[in-house]
């Protein structure tokens, strides 16, 4: 499963949910008629998407098994995933060799070996993508996802090496 977003909570009273997508484009999840909701390391449950729409930087969606606000509220915090076999194939290496969701949770370490935190999300700014890096002190760093800064993405080791100082 590739985690593609997170349920932020209910939206309105008719059972709709608000979704924070982890996809390159806000509407990327709407390409899939079924979503799997659950938690990493836990069980995944298939939900049929009835309707969805972009609402600023989030998605609003109506799911077949979610008839009212109470049902939608019970989904808050769950991850949304798609089986990897249903996703487009990626090149073996390079910037396009992984999905954004593959980067979530990776440790971010600078060239001096200092741990900056873990990837909490990514932002699309138009000029370039930006890593949202959260550290244990609950502070957030925004690190540009550009060649001059991102030295290496090592999915197997679970880390991203960056040319970025602690004081930036």
Curated annotation (Swiss-Prot):
InterPro entries: PRC_barrel-like_sf, PRC_RimM, RimM, RimM_N, RimM_N_sf, Transl_B-barrel_sf. GO terms for molecular function: ribosome binding. Binds ribosomal protein uS19. One of its GO terms (cellular component) is ribosome. This is Ribosome maturation factor RimM. An accessory protein needed during the final step in the assembly of 30S ribosomal subunit, possibly for assembly of the head region. Essential for efficient processing of 16S rRNA. May be needed both before and after RbfA during the maturation of 16S rRNA. It has affinity for free ribosomal 30S subunits but not for 70S ribosomes. The PRC barrel domain binds ribosomal protein uS19. GO terms for biological process: ribosomal small subunit biogenesis; rRNA processing. Belongs to the RimM family. Keywords: Chaperone, Cytoplasm, Ribosome biogenesis, rRNA processing. The lineage of its organism: Bacteria, Pseudomonadati, Pseudomonadota, Betaproteobacteria, Nitrosomonadales. The gene is rimM. It holds the Pfam family RimM.
């Amino acid at each position: 499963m590739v985690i593609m977003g997170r349920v932020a909570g209910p939206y309105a009273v008719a059972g709709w949910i608000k979704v924070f997508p982890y996809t390159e484009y806000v509407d990327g999840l709407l390409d899939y008629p079924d979503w799997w909701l659950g938690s990493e390391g836990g069980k995944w449950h298939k939900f049929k998407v009835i309707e969805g729409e972009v609402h600023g930087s989030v998605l609003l969606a109506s799911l077949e098994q979610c008839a009212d606000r109470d049902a939608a509220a019970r989904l808050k915090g769950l991850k949304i995933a798609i089986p990897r076999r249903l996703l487009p194939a990626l090149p073996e290496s390079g910037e396009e060799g992984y999905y954004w969701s593959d980067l979530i949770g990776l440790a971010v370490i600078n060239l001096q070996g200092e741990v900056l935190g873990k990837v909490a999300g990514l932002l699309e700014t138009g000029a370039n993508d930006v890593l949202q890096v959260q550290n244990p002190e609950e502070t957030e760093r925004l690190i540009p996802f550009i060649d001059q800064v991102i030295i290496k993405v090592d999915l197997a080791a679970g880390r991203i090496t960056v040319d970025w100082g602690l004081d930036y």
